[in-house]
A protein has these predicted regions:
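C-terminal and inter-domain tail/linker signature
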Residues: 1-125
């Protein structure tokens, strides 16, 4: 499946080869903000930070058709359990051109937003 390399990177928390998986102008749609992030540099920071925040991350289902894939995951942030989906769209070059993440329940999303905000603020000085 096209999404296997991404799945392996996410499950192993190894995003060192993000540039080999995503297009340079990838569009990332976060569950926390409406405006998408654009570009590989932003994506590297976000994926690296979320990999630090999520505990017990695992994919529990995967569906692919044509140029799209949906990966269903479960994770934990502290005592908050959450479920989510990564929706990937592949470009003609086979690289991921767009990624959209959705998370439930709201308490899990709120925990993610809070912890991501804290870590990103600390990283930017």
């Amino acid at each position: 499946m096209k999404s296997d390399a991404f799945r392996h990177a996410a499950e192993s928390k190894d995003f060192s080869k993000v540039g080999e998986l995503f297009s340079e102008d990838v569009v990332f749609r976060s569950p926390a903000v409406f405006q998408p992030y654009t570009g590989l540099d932003s994506l590297k920071v976000l994926l690296g930070t979320v990999a630090e925040v999520f505990e017990d991350f695992r994919y529990v289902d995967q569906v692919e058709t044509g140029d799209s894939a949906v990966l269903v995951f479960e994770a934990r942030i502290g005592e908050r359990e959450l479920h989510g989906v990564d929706v990937l769209r592949f470009g003609e070059d086979g690289l991921i051109a767009e990624m959209m993440v959705m998370i439930r329940p709201l308490s899990g999303l709120n925990a993610l937003v809070e912890e991501m905000g804290r870590r990103l603020a600390a990283a930017s000085g």
